[in-house]
Amino acid sequence: MSDIAGEARKIALQNAVSHGGRAREGAVLAGLLGARPELRPKAGELMEEISDIVAGINAMPESKQREELGDVPVERKKQEGQALPPLEGAIKGRVVTRFPPEPNGYPHIGHAKAAIINEEYVTMYGGIKILRMDDTNPGAERMEYYAAIKVGLDWLGIEYDVIKNTSDDMDLLLSKGRELLESGDAYVCTCKRDDMSKNRRAMAPCKCSKKAQEDHMEGWDKMHGKFKPGQAVARFRGDMESQNTVMRDPVLFRIMEERHPLLGDRHRVWPSYDMAVAIEDSIDGVTHAFRSKEYELRNELYGAILGKLDMRAPMVLEFSRLEFEGMPVSKRVIRPLIEDGKIPWYDDPRLPTLEGMKKRGITPGAIRRFVISLGLTKADTLAPFGALEAFNRKEIDGNSTRLFLVGDPRRIDVAGLPGTAELPNHPSGDMGSRKIETGGALYLPGKDAEGLSEGGHIRLMGLGDVRIDSAGRDLAGTYTGDDISAGYPKMQWVPCGDARKIKVVIPRAPIKDGEFDSSSLGILEGMVEPHYLQVGDGQSIQFVRFGYCRKESQHMAVFTHG
């Protein structure tokens, strides 16, 4: 068995024993790609092997699954937090929500907000959570993005009762399009795009709308074969004089010949977002459809489409978009930064992508609490990143090992220094302690060392007091005891003999005054005490008098916040 297959099998076993003996292919793929990001471009190829692995594990008795796995994974704790406001029209046990991301990019904080709100209301009232990939734009969708979304949601701790794709229902969506044409509530338009836009601005009816019914049905058939992309679209027969521009005969179907990542070239006529989301929400049994405020004007069209088709209409609710100042969520902004080499990838800690925030050390629990604290307001504001940091600080403080980090290190030789120091790993005392061999020579922070003078005193944190005997190029001192009441200036330190050199990446907002800030990623090179090597990769650390960081590797940490 290959390493990849072995890892996938372990993830599948963990998923199975956590869900009554039944593993899910999507969850296994998400877990594998989360652990091995380099495999994302091969997500499509991996699915076949994962399907076989999952089928085999699901055929095993649960006792055998547990036996092979060994230790059963601990279930994630539900995060506590403020409650969202009551949900209008909610019936206990019958709330159905959906999160419908388009697999055309990596998920970000805005996706997290939508997903969490949908999940929280089902948790509050009971019901069904649906994950539905809104994948009806074949040229933009990629298997890599389907996988990235699932990885992000899994990291957030969100699980779904139903997972599907809008493209699963293409035959139904096309039949509903034909139904609208047959009832006269839609028509086929062959106008050029510029002419369509001009008529909509002028509130002038399209000449195509006046054609005979049989012409529209013939045009619909030609859209599936003879017409080329851009030569024809199917439009909703709305109201060209409406003050709501969305209702001025919007496009419902268009021709696109790009291969779809799941369906290949099976279809060339694809529904617009407005057509697809309305039909899907209705047939999926959604009771409350949440979407961001930017879609508010489209609610009238949403209801009109379902009304013409005599289909059930869910309640639609809006919330404001979530963005941070200087931290773009738009693909139109992020992609050029990556393509131009200004930002290496979507997991850059300067970005508000889920991968970027994970790398920075922001926790899923902090994101959830932050989102809930914002409520359902529709007022568009740029949220302060500091507010998220405050929630994160509460999340990570209790399990962040305290360590010393010395930037721009200056050596000092100290006579009479105790050979070892025992320091608590956390002020609470709940995380044990560590011993450091001092060796008689230490590194001090260069900035602090600049202010030292002969005859002065400093207190080495957790070690004792030192008199400065030489403050020139070569620092030297003498240990004078451990009198904390003396009130000497405190300094962190690391032993010269066992100190480890690391880089600390310091992310800042990448956009300043509308332009990319080339200085937005700072680097601090310093020396850290040897216990750093014992901390697991991905764990949170608080470097004393510096801030919280996430350990990326034995040689690098990422600054989270102060």
Curated annotation (Swiss-Prot):
Disulfide bonds: none annotated. The keyword ATP-binding applies. Its main location: cytoplasm. It is found in: Cytoplasm. One of its GO terms (biological process) is glutamyl-tRNA aminoacylation. Belongs to the class-I aminoacyl-tRNA synthetase family. Glutamate--tRNA ligase type 2 subfamily. This is Glutamate--tRNA ligase. It comes from Cenarchaeum symbiosum (strain A).
